[in-house]
Amino acid sequence: MDSNPGADQAVAPIVEQALRTAMSAGWEVRGTTSPNPPVGAVIISTSGEIVGTGATQPVGGVHAEVQALADAAGKTEGATAVVTLEPCRHTGRTGPCTQALIEAGIKDVLFLHSDPNPSAGGGEQVLVDAGINVVQLPSPEGVPDALIPWLKSVQLRRPHVTLKFAQTIDGFTAAADGTSQWITGEMARDYVHADREHRDAIIIGTGTALIDNPSLTARYPDGTQREHQPRRVVIGRRNIADAGDAASNLNRLGFEQYATIDEALAELYATGARDVLVEGGAGLASGFANQGLVDWLQVYQAPLLLGEGISVLAHPLTNTLKGASALCPRAASGAGR
């Protein structure tokens, strides 16, 4: 076993290409695999060619390694498997991926992340005991990693939370009269819908539900619905089911309501959600932030000035600069206005 991320095999061009391909495959299935992780896998033949690619299928379907092995049928003996997550060793709805790799005659297994799940982890040692060379790879630069939210969720025993909001350049999410449509442009809104498709749930507060009457669906620019739809979740004590026309879209499409943030996150995690998007409003955003429950921020900033208006957070987090929450920027890009 060689768990040194700097091993020569880890930096071979074909291995880096295979890892990037595997990460891309995992990225594409985000939102469709929970509670299982969105894993990608690639098979490299003995001649050094990529001959199989796979990704985790929805619950009950095959795991990434099994799909990649099937894609590489007849070319797996002595081959190398490159996987974004340590292969599982447990039997659930499907058999252990370690056994599938062993039976396929795989010689080397290169993986990116260790599996923190006690029931599934430990696959590395199973493979080593079977005589397979195992190497843990370093993360390549500039490649989105679909597993980060899932890994964080397993660690925290709650869904990974991204707080999303749009704001003017002076920090307001709506004007003083309450108008907010639209701070951002069409390109940004299209991106939001594409992102929603890859989330397990979209969360809003009762105020947003009653004021905006949102659908919380993932749609294409022409208005048609995308293939995967996240769960629609409302947090708060006002009864949305009895709100009539004020919340007609949610009542037509169906939604879940929980009284508190803690109750919502506990039930969402228990029922398989691992990656959720909080879309507002200011009171709910404050609640998540004050409880230290925001893992990522997704901010759309428009080149607009208001001077006054409704802030992102309804309640302060601190009254001193020393108490401010320090953030670590991950990426920035343009998305129109």
From Swiss-Prot:
Pfam families hit by this protein: dCMP_cyt_deam_1, RibD_C
Family: In the N-terminal section; belongs to the cytidine and deoxycytidylate deaminase family.
Protein name: Riboflavin biosynthesis protein RibD
Organism: Corynebacterium ammoniagenes (Brevibacterium ammoniagenes)
The organism's place on the tree of life at top rank: Bacteria
Catalysed reactions listed for this entry: 2,5-diamino-6-hydroxy-4-(5-phosphoribosylamino)-pyrimidine + H2O + H(+) = 5-amino-6-(5-phospho-D-ribosylamino)uracil + NH4(+); 5-amino-6-(5-phospho-D-ribitylamino)uracil + NADP(+) = 5-amino-6-(5-phospho-D-ribosylamino)uracil + NADPH + H(+)
Keyword Zinc listed: yes
Active site: E65
